Amino acid sequence: MEDKYILLSAVETFKSRLEELLMQSAKVQKQTMLRKELASSMNDMASTVQEALNKKKSS
């Protein structure tokens, strides 16, 4: 009976840790997505500024 309790406790601990890791993974994926969106926005802004500078030079 005691072995069964020890095994159940180990399974619960494993389950809890796995849930924590899944949550951390989701946070990392979200941060990665946000970084990509930020980089894309910065590239768009840089392109817009470059176009404006080119137009100003040609005027």
From Swiss-Prot:
Keyword Ribosomal protein belongs to the record: no
Taxonomic superkingdom: Eukaryota
Compartment(s) of residence: Nucleus; Chromosome, Centromere, Kinetochore; Cytoplasm, Cytoskeleton, Microtubule organizing center, Spindle pole body
GO cellular component: cytosol; kinetochore; microtubule; Mis6-Sim4 complex; nucleus; spindle pole body
GO annotation terms (biological process): cell division; mitotic sister chromatid segregation
Keywords: Cell cycle, Cell division, Centromere, Chromosome, Chromosome partition, Cytoplasm, Cytoskeleton, Kinetochore, Microtubule, Mitosis, Nucleus
Subunit text: Component of the inner kinetochore constitutive centromere-associated network (CCAN) (also known as central kinetochore Sim4 complex in fission yeast), which is composed of at least cnl2, cnp3, cnp20, fta1, fta2, fta3, fta4, fta6, fta7, mal2, mhf1, mhf2, mis6, mis15, mis17, sim4 and wip1.
Function noted in UniProt: Component of the kinetochore, a multiprotein complex that assembles on centromeric DNA and attaches chromosomes to spindle microtubules, mediating chromosome segregation and sister chromatid segregation during meiosis and mitosis. Component of the inner kinetochore constitutive centromere-associated network (CCAN), which serves as a structural platform for outer kinetochore assembly.
Annotated protein name in UniProt: Inner kinetochore subunit fta6
Classification of source organism: Eukaryota, Fungi, Dikarya, Ascomycota, Taphrinomycotina
